[in-house]
């Protein structure tokens, strides 16, 4: 790909970001606060998803395997 094409594409993405968030009407210091808050929220959502979703999926699998007659992990280990 051409470097100019990549630069144009990134500037187009940034323009779309400004239009979607309506942050083009903010002053520069307001934009920096808005961008900082947005990045902080996105980082917290990603971190929370990384930490808590696997735990909840494991608990849900254990719960539903118990309901539908699945064997517990310790029982399977003893039978092997």
From Swiss-Prot:
Determine the domain of life of the protein's source. Answer: Eukaryota
Residues in the Lumenal compartment per record:
30-36
Q: Which InterPro entries does the protein's record reference?
A: Ser_palmitoyltrfase_ssu-like
List, alphabetically, the GO terms of the cellular component aspect.
endoplasmic reticulum membrane; serine palmitoyltransferase complex
Q: What is its main location?
A: endoplasmic reticulum
Pfam families the record matches: SPT_ssu-like
| Alphabetical keyword list | Endoplasmic reticulum, Lipid metabolism, Membrane, Sphingolipid metabolism, Transmembrane, Transmembrane helix
Quick one: signal sequence residues? none
Q: Which GO terms describe its biological process?
A: ceramide biosynthetic process; endoplasmic reticulum organization; sphingolipid biosynthetic process
- Chain ranges sitting on the Cytoplasmic side read 1-11, 58-80
Question: Its membrane topology, per UniProt?
Answer: Multi-pass membrane protein
Q: Which residues cross the membrane?
A: 12-29, 37-57
Q: Where is it localised?
A: Endoplasmic reticulum membrane
What quaternary structure, including any partners, is listed in this protein's UniProt entry? Component of the serine palmitoyltransferase (SPT) complex, which is composed of SPTLC1, SPTLC2 or SPTLC3 and SPTSSA or SPTSSB. The heterodimer consisting of SPTLC1 and SPTLC2/SPTLC3 forms the catalytic core of the enzyme, while SPTSSA or SPTSSB subunits determine substrate specificity. SPT also interacts with ORMDL proteins, especially ORMDL3, which negatively regulate SPT activity in the presence of ceramides.
Q: Which family does it belong to?
A: Belongs to the SPTSS family. SPTSSB subfamily.
The UniProt function text for this chain reads: Component of the serine palmitoyltransferase multisubunit enzyme (SPT) that catalyzes the initial and rate-limiting step in sphingolipid biosynthesis by condensing L-serine and activated acyl-CoA (most commonly palmitoyl-CoA) to form long-chain bases. The SPT complex is composed of SPTLC1, SPTLC2 or SPTLC3 and SPTSSA or SPTSSB. Within this complex, the heterodimer consisting of SPTLC1 and SPTLC2/SPTLC3 forms the catalytic core. Within the SPT complex, SPTSSB stimulates the catalytic activity and plays a role in substrate specificity.
The name this protein carries in UniProt is: Serine palmitoyltransferase small subunit B
Question: Which species?
Answer: Xenopus tropicalis
């Amino acid at each position: 790909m051409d470097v100019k094409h990549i630069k144009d594409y990134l500037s187009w993405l940034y323009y779309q970001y400004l239009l979607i968030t309506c942050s083009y009407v903010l002053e520069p210091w307001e934009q920096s606060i808005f961008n900082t808050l947005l990045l902080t929220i996105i980082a917290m959502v990603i971190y929370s998803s990384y930490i808590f979703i696997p735990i909840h999926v494991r608990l849900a699998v254990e719960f539903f395997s118990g309901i539908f007659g699945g064997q517990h992990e310790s029982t399977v280990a003893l039978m092997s």
